[in-house]
Amino acid sequence: MGTARIAPGLALLLCCPVLSSAYALVDADDVMTKEEQIFLLHRAQAQCEKRLKEVLQRPASIMESDKGWTSASTSGKPRKDKASGKLYPESEEDKEAPTGSRYRGRPCLPEWDHILCWPLGAPGEVVAVPCPDYIYDFNHKGHAYRRCDRNGSWELVPGHNRTWANYSECVKFLTNETREREVFDRLGMIYTVGYSVSLASLTVAVLILAYFRRLHCTRNYIHMHLFLSFMLRAVSIFVKDAVLYSGATLDEAERLTEEELRAIAQAPPPPATAAAGYAGCRVAVTFFLYFLATNYYWILVEGLYLHSLIFMAFFSEKKYLWGFTVFGWGLPAVFVAVWVSVRATLANTGCWDLSSGNKKWIIQVPILASIVLNFILFINIVRVLATKLRETNAGRCDTRQQYRKLLKSTLVLMPLFGVHYIVFMATPYTEVSGTLWQVQMHYEMLFNSFQGFFVAIIYCFCNGEVQAEIKKSWSRWTLALDFKRKARSGSSSYSYGPMVSHTSVTNVGPRVGLGLPLSPRLLPTATTNGHPQLPGHAKPGTPALETLETTPPAMAAPKDDGFLNGSCSGLDEEASGPERPPALLQEEWETVM
């Protein structure tokens, strides 16, 4: 129960630095919501208007000098646009000017076009301005272009009363290219299929472990909690996607044009009452983050439980089960609640599904800590497995066979410990691009979505005791079905030694055992001291006849395959480690080896 006492202190330690450093509304390195983008555009507009006032207050002689526009202008010769490849011809006035000359006169005035702040433009030249970095989805390595004619006016679009501007280099990331669409469609298909398969297999696994009473023990209870966390994670992802993208597809939500950017920039900041429309979306995102965190922490619980069984001399499984339950479900609730409070107070914008600046570390730091701690436990357990393998197989098998056994045990433990999270843990997907980004996203989508399926296969469907219980249940069901079929036929055969009696069902008295029809195959042919050996009777020191009529299900112990896939009998004892019976301790190693 020590984990329950540590949880409040750990949450306070995590939230205090975040509360003291939550000074920014948005983080420029993260994906931004529409409201956050509006905030940045309005801030850029205010800065631009301030600069415009300073420029317009200059004397006209200074504005008409060469220094007013040399920094942002290019030559007046015809220019080929980089993005479209089109050639923009010179005006008639431009053609009259000698090559390499510079026009003097009234420049094009600086202005804000609701996207970026244009500087002074030299007459007859093309003005190039870097794409603004405050628009997240822009290509920040490109440029936007305008043309200032010889009369000192920004060139207009032919046939339209609006200024011509070329943003093609900036918005190339916003266009729906076929290759990018295929990548996102493939990623969506991978995680949808993966989580669906995991959800179905985990549901069956939980029902199996809950149905058979002989499978009820601390180890399987922890497995059931882990399975449930995987299931809730998958369900929360599907619910979140349905809520976020209801009414508009993902492609429509990501497709932006220059006109839409202008409309966003011209829109006033959303009022505080607009947040009420995001209530359902925010609830879905909050539950998704909570179940995501609980999944990581129940993976950590599995590692702590196995590590405790191996290294603790006295370990009460039943007593510590409650502590593990509080740790797995309660601790994530603490730091998720802290994140909700901070987000609602300091960054209550949008659906909470995207950027929230430094406040994201309230959730990410505990999750990253659980991944690192679980990886350390995994390395230590594999080390003990290797030592145990060398000791038990010294002189009995070659080195290659030992390595194969160690590799098998390591692969069995990897899905349980979530080792695949370590690969890209130090590389956020927002910091990479190109081929590396595609490799990372395909890797994470594949293993994260199918992890629940792998865990269900290894720790339930391949479990020897689970298979034995299913086979016994199937045998009982088929025997009962066969008996009902014979009972409906109207007659049954009963055999007592050499005599066979054919009677009607209506004349049958009390039946033996379960009332199943007996045949000569079920009776022994040998006698003991002149008396027939009846079913269920065994002389002391001789094996009893194993039949369904004489052996209760609770007494028919199947073969124990060990700790991870073995029998629950004896695993809930108070003693463990060196105090545990040698036979049981040996069984616990058999599965992973």
Curated annotation (Swiss-Prot):
A motif (Important for interaction with G proteins) lies at residues 474-477. It comes from the Eukaryota. Changing Y195F: Decreased potencies of parathyroid hormone (PTH) and parathyroid hormone-related peptide (PTHLH). InterPro entries: GPCR_2, GPCR_2-like_7TM, GPCR_2_extracell_dom_sf, GPCR_2_extracellular_dom, GPCR_2_parathyroid_rcpt, GPCR_2_secretin-like, GPCR_2_secretin-like_CS. Residues 540-554 have a biased composition (Low complexity). The chain crosses the membrane at residues 187-211, 220-241, 283-307, 321-342, 358-382, 407-426, 435-462. GO terms for cellular component: apical plasma membrane; basolateral plasma membrane; cytoplasm; cytosol; nucleolus; nucleus; plasma membrane; receptor complex. Residues 27-186, 242-282, 343-357, 427-434 are extracellular. Expressed in most tissues. Most abundant in kidney, bone and liver. Residues 1-26 form the signal peptide. Pfam families: 7tm_2, HRM. One of its GO terms (molecular function) is protein homodimerization activity. Its main location: membrane. It is found in: Cell membrane. Residues 212-219, 308-320, 383-406, 463-593 are cytoplasmic. It is a multi-pass membrane protein. Keywords: Cell membrane, Disease variant, Disulfide bond, Dwarfism, G-protein coupled receptor, Glycoprotein, Membrane, Phosphoprotein, Receptor, Signal, Transducer, Transmembrane, Transmembrane helix. Disulfide bonds join C48-C117, C108-C148, C131-C170. Glycans are attached at N151, N161, N166, N176. One of its GO terms (biological process) is skeletal system development. Homodimer in the absence of bound ligand. Peptide hormone binding leads to dissociation of the homodimer. This is Parathyroid hormone/parathyroid hormone-related peptide receptor. It comes from Homo sapiens.
